[in-house]
Amino acid sequence: AYAKDPVYPLEKTVANLTLDILNTAGPARDVVLVGEGQSELEDDLARAAAAQGRSVTPETLPENGLFYRADHFSLARGGVPVLLIMQIAGGADLVDGGREAGDQWIRDYIGNCYHQTCDAWNADWDLRGAVQDMELFRVIIEDLGNSRRWPQWRAGSEFKAIRDQSAEVRREE
C-alpha cells in the first residue's frame, strides 16, 4: 500500500531494509540474505556483518521465491533498492549448536507455529540473535543517513531500469 501512496516519492527513497521473522533462537554466526545479487545493499550488509564477526549466507531455496513474496516487494517494483534478511530462509548457524540447531529451530518454527495461533511472543525466546540483526540494520541506516550515497540495483536486476529512469532526480540533491 505504501508504494502506491508514499509519504516521500519512491525516486527519492534511499533504500528499504526488511527483517522478516525475528531470529528467536539466539545469536548466530551468520545472517541469511534473501534475493542474493539484487542490490549494492548486500555490500553494506557484508561489511556490517563482518564487523560483528558474522558472515552472510544466501537463502538455501531461492526457487521458493521469498524475495518476490515478502513485504518489501512493492517498493522493489517501484525501483527502491531493497535488502531482505530472514534467518528461517535457511542455514542459521547458531552460536549454540551450529547449523544443526539452526535447522532444528527452523523446522520447529515452520512446522509448529508459523502462521498459527502459537505464532506470537514467547517468554522462552532468546532474542540476542534478533538484536544482532537489528544492529546490522542500525549500522547500515546510520551509514546511509550520514552519506550522500544512493544504493543501486546491480546489473541484471529486473528492478534496475526503474531506478535508472529517475536518476536525474537524485542528482539534484
PLM-predicted stretches and their roles:
Residues 7, 49, 53, 118, ...:
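Generic secondary-structure transition motif, activating predominantly at the C-termini of alpha-helices
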Residues 65-73, 155-170:
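Amphipathic alpha-helical surface "interface" segments used
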Residues 1-98, 103-110:
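Metal-dependent peptidase/peptidase-like ectodomains
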Residues 87-163:
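His/Asp/Glu-rich mid-to-C-terminal helical/loop segments that flank catalytic regions of hydrolases
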